[in-house]
Amino acid sequence: MATWGRRRAGLGGRERVTLSAGECYIVHEIYNGENAQDQFEYELEQALEAQYKYIVIEPTRIGDETARWVTVGNCLHKTAVLSGTACLLTPLALPAEYSHYVSLPAGVLSLACSTLYGISWQFDPCCKYQVEYDAYKLSRLPLHTLTSSSPVVLVRKDDIHRKRLHNTIALAALAYCIKKLYELYSV
């Protein structure tokens, strides 16, 4: 029974790894006066700018707001990619006389989402983070020290590839829309 409760590092097993102090930051929910919410926001901003690998947000309100902000950014990214792809692939799937009814609005939507993401999210340090839901990865974090039962955990991820992807697709959709509008109105 000495190994009960431990994971064995064998084939298919996972070894529990401890994190260094510089990898994880916890925004604790400690109310010290009237400006506690401002203090939580300040701590979160400092942690985002310090680029910690993991940020654990204990205060419910600011954690929910941050999770929603990340979700909206993800939605804009996915909408830009999917609508841009629809814009570019619709002419291959539909007859030429009908394809512009789908491809032009999809291209405009892709460009709008990509532009909004670029203006509102691109320079925000929060866009480098994703909300973590994986139970194994969460088990590696020092969550036993928290007072909140449902903290929001952010993990830093490199987003350069996703930005390149949605910008490339949006620009290709823009080029297609300009070409198609020129063809439609030059005749």
From Swiss-Prot:
The keyword Mitochondrion applies. GO terms for biological process: inner mitochondrial membrane organization; mitochondrion organization. It is found in: Mitochondrion inner membrane. It is a multi-pass membrane protein. The keyword Transmembrane applies. Pfam families: Mito_morph_reg. Its main location: mitochondrion. GO terms for cellular component: mitochondrial inner membrane. The chain crosses the membrane at residues 79-95, 102-119. InterPro entries: TMEM11. Plays a role in mitochondrial morphogenesis. PANTHER family: PROTEIN PM1, TRANSMEMBRANE PROTEIN 11, MITOCHONDRIAL. Belongs to the TMEM11 family. This is Transmembrane protein 11-A, mitochondrial. It comes from Xenopus laevis (African clawed frog).
